[in-house]
Amino acid sequence: MKVPPVLLLFLLSSVRATEQPQVVTEHPSMEAALTGPNASSHFWANYTFSDWQNFVGRRRYGAESQNPTVKALLIVAYSFTIVFSLFGNVLVCHVIFKNQRMHSATSLFIVNLAVADIMITLLNTPFTLVRFVNSTWVFGKGMCHVSRFAQYCSLHVSALTLTAIAVDRHQVIMHPLKPRISITKGVIYIAVIWVMATFFSLPHAICQKLFTFKYSEDIVRSLCLPDFPEPADLFWKYLDLATFILLYLLPLFIISVAYARVAKKLWLCNTIGDVTTEQYLALRRKKKTTVKMLVLVVVLFALCWFPLNCYVLLLSSKAIHTNNALYFAFHWFAMSSTCYNPFIYCWLNENFRVELKALLSMCQRPPKPQEDRLPSPVPSFRVAWTEKSHGRRAPLPNHHLPSSQIQSGKTDLSSVEPVVAMS
């Protein structure tokens, strides 16, 4: 049954809001309905008596979020996500900046993707974990706004950057004779991406308040909750709906169309052109592997963020009520998308594998000094080559391209530019 207005006054007396100012985590709640200065009567009447009873009995923010099993699982999951995300995305930036031949617009976009993942890993994920463990927000007003902004801004930057990568790959493969996006233009596009992401993220970050609730003399909790301007219900609903459509569904639609056309070109086109069959097939394998890698990145991003986006959208539409365990599980699943990309790059890109091996070798015990080793009867490669050629380089066995240029399965993020136009 719905809560009578008279009973609302009694319930309000048992939960006293002692302070108001600041951000929201991602799940609005009954506290916002109780204390929000602009909470509408429709929103208040949307809960049953059982809902309000559970809230006053502190089940909503107490026992539900303190389930030991759920807490332990999410602590481990969040911790692994933070460690792997930071290590992997820093490695991505290191590899691209270190390799001169990887300096291209596509590589800049991939670095931008890694930077967005690092931002959300540092400014949102740890704070959300602590909020879940303590059932209260302990970082103050400033970080409440910053954490909320980081989550939305990183999501928007990632979606827009993946769209830019898809458009760039479409341009390179569908129109190989046209000039590619230069590094300067790539920097400009990245700047535009961040401006757009900031613009769409600020409403979520600004419309937040830090509410402090006194349940008893010993139990006081602070919560980051949304506090949208009037009409609050409609503002919240349409803001989340616009965000979901413009910065999640629309980018994924553009990406899908771009990669579908690229796949049709690569998998169905059989024109060889003025190159050998071996060179042509090697080039196609390289481009196919690159496209597969980028498509896999997009698919994982879409799958990881879909549950949380749907949850927030349904919540703002009042189709469901809040659920702590469900929200934090969806939030972790979305945050886990930040640590998958580096593993995909290392799996499908030789440059990343080489750099990872080099970093791991630095952590191993250094070899023994040269004088402690027994002399080898076999001369080194350099000595043997010099003695054999007498200072002259041996001729190549044939006139084909070096095998390193025609190996299959090696992906170069910046070398998808075809040698020949394919019809």
UniProtKB/Swiss-Prot annotation:
Q: Which GO terms describe its molecular function?
A: G protein-coupled receptor activity; neuropeptide receptor activity; neuropeptide Y receptor activity
Q: Does the keyword Lyase apply?
A: no
Query: What InterPro entries does this protein map onto?
Result: GPCR_Rhodpsn, GPCR_Rhodpsn_7TM, NPY_rcpt
SMART domains, A to Z: 7TM_GPCR_Srsx
Family matches, as Pfam families:
7tm_1 (PF00001)
Keyword line: Cell membrane, Disulfide bond, G-protein coupled receptor, Glycoprotein, Membrane, Receptor, Signal, Transducer, Transmembrane, Transmembrane helix
User: On the Cytoplasmic side, which residues?
Assistant: 93-107, 168-186, 261-293, 349-423
Q: In which tissues is it expressed?
A: Predominantly expressed in the brain, with moderate expression in the hypothalamus. Expressed in the thymus.
Q: Which cysteines are joined by disulfide bonds?
A: 144-224
Q: Which residues are glycosylated?
A: 38, 46, 134
Q: Where in the sequence does UniProt note compositional bias of the Polar residues kind? A: 401-414
| Lineage: superkingdom | Eukaryota
Q: Where is the signal peptide?
A: 1-17
Task: Please give the record's induction comment.
Answer: By glucocorticoids and cAMP in T-cells.
State where the protein is found.
Cell membrane
Disruption-associated phenotype: Deficient mice have normal body weight and glucose tolerance when fed a regular chow diet, but are protected from obesity and glucose intolerance when challenged with a high-fat diet. Knockdown of GPR83 has minimal impact on anxiety-like behaviors in female mice and a decrease in anxiety-related behaviors in male mice. In contrast, a local GPR83 knockdown in the basolateral amygdala leads to more anxiety-related behaviors in female mice.
- In the UniProt record, which is one GO cellular component term? plasma membrane
Residue ranges in the Extracellular topological domain are 18-71, 130-145, 209-238, 316-327
Question: Where does this protein chiefly localize?
Answer: membrane
The UniProt transmembrane annotation reads 72-92, 108-129, 146-167, 187-208, 239-260, 294-315, 328-348
Per the record, membrane topology reads: Multi-pass membrane protein
Please give the biological process terms from Gene Ontology that the record holds. Answer: feeding behavior; G protein-coupled receptor signaling pathway; neuropeptide signaling pathway; phospholipase C-activating G protein-coupled receptor signaling pathway; response to glucocorticoid
Q: Where is this region: Disordered?
A: 389-423
What is its biological role?
G-protein coupled receptor for PEN, a neuropeptide produced from the precursor protein, proSAAS (encoded by PCSK1N). Acts through a G(i)- and G(q)-alpha-alpha-mediated pathway in response to PEN. Plays a role in food intake and body weight regulation. May contribute to the regulation of anxiety-related behaviors.
Instruction: Tell me the protein family, please.
Output: Belongs to the G-protein coupled receptor 1 family.
Q: What is this protein called?
A: G-protein coupled receptor 83
Please report the organism this UniProt entry assigns to the protein: Mus musculus (Mouse)
Q: What is the lineage of its organism?
A: Eukaryota, Metazoa, Chordata, Craniata, Vertebrata
Which gene is this protein's source? Answer: Gpr83
